[in-house]
């Protein structure tokens, strides 16, 4: 029964340009079983790193988050797939509750499924699925091959045997992945071309983080507001990359751009001459290079603004006082 999760959002990666390499459409399902009666199903559909649809569990309908999220699918086709999901979630919950105790899974537990299809620059397709229970990988499927995760071989084999008992479901999943998904993926790529091809230049700035130890500095390079997601950021000494550079995860901003924080722990006397270099497709080869110690802190900027204002204010007070004193004499 778990395999029907493969059909999530017709099923379907980084999206850099339209078909420059690989682009995937995939659905993410998270089903949380709190007890025998309370279950929460969440789902979302993604084109590369962009969320384009989600599942409304109350209305049991698909929410399309982009004007082009339907691709070239008709309203009747949308209704048809929504009906498939409605039947699926009902059956999925029933079968999971029936069989999870057989596999010694205790409440509360969570089942996560990611599934979809991928197209490469040669327009050939692959489809895939991964299933996890309580955050532990259980099994993976790619094209017509299935293999259990090393940490759950025996349990995965038992579940796979159970799944194969539902032949009609497996046949439906295969059609959705091998026929419906490629058609949907290509149509949504074409419909969302302007969004997928957009380029947004990053902003970058330096700051000092908390000291990692006596005599040490933590240099922080912030890069924000860029799209698409792939970016290269590195601390440098001249033209030499510093392997001690520590990169965090690339995080999403609210406006669908991205943010990255890159740090370097260095002895205070060795900080001079270091720079942070940023490469991104939107920069068209004109890398951003920020030199440590050459940037002006916020405090100095504020001071530079306040000092002239204070001087003007003092001069005005002196002028007003002299004028008042002069008029008082006469």
UniProtKB/Swiss-Prot annotation:
Membrane topology term: Single-pass type I membrane protein
Subcellular location: Cell membrane; Endosome membrane; Lysosome membrane
Top-level division of the source organism's lineage: Eukaryota
SUPFAM superfamilies: Immunoglobulin (SSF48726), MHC antigen-recognition domain (SSF54452)
Cytoplasmic side: 321-330
Stretches in topological domain Extracellular: 16-299
Motif range (Internalization signal): 326-329
Record carries keyword Transmembrane: yes
GO CC annotation terms, alphabetical: endosome membrane; external side of plasma membrane; extracellular space; lysosomal membrane
GO biological process terms, semicolon-separated: adaptive immune response; antigen processing and presentation, endogenous lipid antigen via MHC class Ib; antigen processing and presentation, exogenous lipid antigen via MHC class Ib; positive regulation of T cell mediated cytotoxicity
Carbohydrate-modified residues: 35, 72, 143
Pfam families: C1-set (PF07654), MHC_I_3 (PF16497)
Domain Ig-like: 182-292
Transmembrane segments: 300-320
InterPro entries given in the database record: Ig-like_dom (IPR007110), Ig-like_dom_sf (IPR036179), Ig-like_fold (IPR013783), Ig_C1-set (IPR003597), MHC_class-I_related (IPR050208), MHC_I-like_Ag-recog (IPR011161), MHC_I-like_Ag-recog_sf (IPR037055), MHC_I/II-like_Ag-recog (IPR011162)
Leader peptide range in chain numbering: 1-15
GO MF entries: endogenous lipid antigen binding; exogenous lipid antigen binding; lipopeptide binding
Disulphide bond pairs: 117-181, 221-276
Keywords: Adaptive immunity, Cell membrane, Disulfide bond, Endosome, Glycoprotein, Immunity, Immunoglobulin domain, Lysosome, Membrane, Signal, Transmembrane, Transmembrane helix
Assembly mode: Heterodimer with B2M (beta-2-microglobulin). Interacts with saposin C.
Family annotation (PANTHER family): MHC CLASS I-RELATED (PTHR16675), T-CELL SURFACE GLYCOPROTEIN CD1B (PTHR16675:SF130)
Further facts: During protein synthesis and maturation, CD1 family members bind endogenous lipids that are replaced by lipid or glycolipid antigens when the proteins are internalized and pass through endosomes or lysosomes, before trafficking back to the cell surface. Interaction with saposin C is required for the loading of bacterial lipid antigens onto CD1B in the lysosome.
Functional summary from the UniProt entry: Antigen-presenting protein that binds self and non-self lipid and glycolipid antigens and presents them to T-cell receptors on natural killer T-cells.
Protein's name according to its UniProt entry: T-cell surface glycoprotein CD1b4
Organism expressing this protein natively: Cavia porcellus (Guinea pig)
Gene for this chain: CD1B4
């Amino acid at each position: 029964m778990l395999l029907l999760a493969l059909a999530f959002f017709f099923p379907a990666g980084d999206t850099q340009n339209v078909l420059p390499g690989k682009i995937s459409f995939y659905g993410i399902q998270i089903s949380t079983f709190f007890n025998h009666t309370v279950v929460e199903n969440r789902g979302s559909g993604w084109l590369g790193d962009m969320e384009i649809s989600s599942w409304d569990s109350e209305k049991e309908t698909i929410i399309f988050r982009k004007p082009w999220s339907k691709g070239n699918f008709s309203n009747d086709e949308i209704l048809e797939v929504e009906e498939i999901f409605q039947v699926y979630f009902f059956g999925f919950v029933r079968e999971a509750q029936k069989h999870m105790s057989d596999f010694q899974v205790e409440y509360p537990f969570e089942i996560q499924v990611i599934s979809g299809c991928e197209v490469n620059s040669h327009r050939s397709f692959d489809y895939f699925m991964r299933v996890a229970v309580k955050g532990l990988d259980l099994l993976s499927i790619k094209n017509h091959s299935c293999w259990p995760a090393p940490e759950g071989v025996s349990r995965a084999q038992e579940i796979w045997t159970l799944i194969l008992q539902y032949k009609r479901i497996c046949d439906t999943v295969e059609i959705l992945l091998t026929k419906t998904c490629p058609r949907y993926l290509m149509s949504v790529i074409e419909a969302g071309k302007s969004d997928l091809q957009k380029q947004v230049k990053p902003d970058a700035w330096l700051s000092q983080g908390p000291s990692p130890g006596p005599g040490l500095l933590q240099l922080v390079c912030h890069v924000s507001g860029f799209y698409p997601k792939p970016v290269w950021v590195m601390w440098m000494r001249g033209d030499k990359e510093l392997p001690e550079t520590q990169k965090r995860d690339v995080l999403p901003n609210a406006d669908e751009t991205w943010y990255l924080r890159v740090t370097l722990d260095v002895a205070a006397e060795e900080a001079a001459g270091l720079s942070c270099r940023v490469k991104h497709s939107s920069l068209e080869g004109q890398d951003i290079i920020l030199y440590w110690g050459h940037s002006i802190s916020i405090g100095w900027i504020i001071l530079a603004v306040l000092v002239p204002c204070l001087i003007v204010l003092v001069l005005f007070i002196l002028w007003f006082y002299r004028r008042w004193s002069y008029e008082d004499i006469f």
